[in-house]
Amino acid sequence: MENNRRFPLLLSSFWLKIIAILTMTVDHIGVMFDITPCRYIGRLALPLFCFLAAEGVMHTKNFKKYILRLGIMASVISIILIGSETIPFFHDLNLGLRYEGIIFLDLLLGVVAVYCLMNKRWYIKLLAILPLAYGIASFIASAFDECGCYGEVLWFPYFIRTQYGWFGIALVIGFYVAHLLAKLFFKLQSNTSGIDADTYKGTRTEQIAVNIISALILAVLTLLYFLVHNIMEQYIYVRVIYHVQLLSIISGAFILLYSGARGYNKKWFQYGSYLYYPLHLAIIAAIAAIVFSI
């Protein structure tokens, strides 16, 4: 009972997703209407989505369907990005979507990387570096494209880029690694305490350990992302206000409260949460178009 008071695990996957969706929506309102405080709130969304992606790939019963959903959504967003640049009406709105990237591609590549790492064959595990390399290439291409000092980057088109370069992919991988580190911790502890490491498997104590390590990994990767941007800024212009991304660390507070339970998971909510992304963007963009045309 004392442990419950100290570490109340209150949030299921359902509630983490709700929080992620709400903060993402606030963020996109901030993008369309240039409201800075909304962008601050929006920094909490990415780590939560990445955390859920890592949990999803580890517990999914059908990996092919899981990546198919992410792949379809990534393709839809890619088409939207192309349309925003090629269709005159949307191009004239100057929404700046070409710089946004495809968030579902971040999640897809992160999930594929984790799937490779979960494989028992070492040469399959090594393939996990390919999604991360893709994210790094996307990050570099976006940096040069936003800088504009080298002209348009044609070797890596904007409609196949990740939204956060390597950062989102690394987060998904990192949250999976948190589970491995937790198991290692209990294994090392068993050597000194004499308690079998399997005793903690599937327990509340194990979940707390995973949550704490996940929050620490989030902090380290966020600081690394900040450092990389800070170094880049010394040499090229960086359009993104990367300092704001440091607020992502706050989402670790929600991760610390994760119970490990799935929670509400009806089919309509599963597919609705995917469809919500393009629909809410379309609604916010339409409202912005009306407001700015008045």
Descriptions of predicted regions:
Residues 1-294:
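Alpha-helical transmembrane segments and their immediate juxtamembrane cytosolic regions
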